Structure formats: structure tokens, C-alpha cells
Amino acid sequence: MRFEHENLPQRIXFG
């Protein structure tokens, strides 16, 4: 998982 460029809003949702 090296795509934390647009994974900011998804990270909250996912995590």
C-alpha cells in the first residue's frame, strides 16, 4: 500500500 496520495479520505473509511 504505497498510494497515500489520494488515500487520505479512504484511509478513514477503510481504517
UniProtKB/Swiss-Prot annotation:
Family of the protein in this entry: Belongs to the iron-containing alcohol dehydrogenase family.
Keyword Oxidoreductase: yes
Name of the molecule in the record: Putative maleylacetate reductase 2
Listed pathway(s): Aromatic compound metabolism; 3-chlorocatechol degradation
GO process annotations (BP): catabolic process
GO molecular function ontology, one term from the record: maleylacetate reductase activity
Keywords associated with the record: Aromatic hydrocarbons catabolism, NAD, Oxidoreductase
EC number(s) recorded for this UniProt protein: 1.3.1.32
Lineage: Bacteria, Bacillati, Actinomycetota, Actinomycetes, Mycobacteriales
Catalytic activity: 3-oxoadipate + NAD(+) = maleylacetate + NADH + H(+); 3-oxoadipate + NADP(+) = maleylacetate + NADPH + H(+)
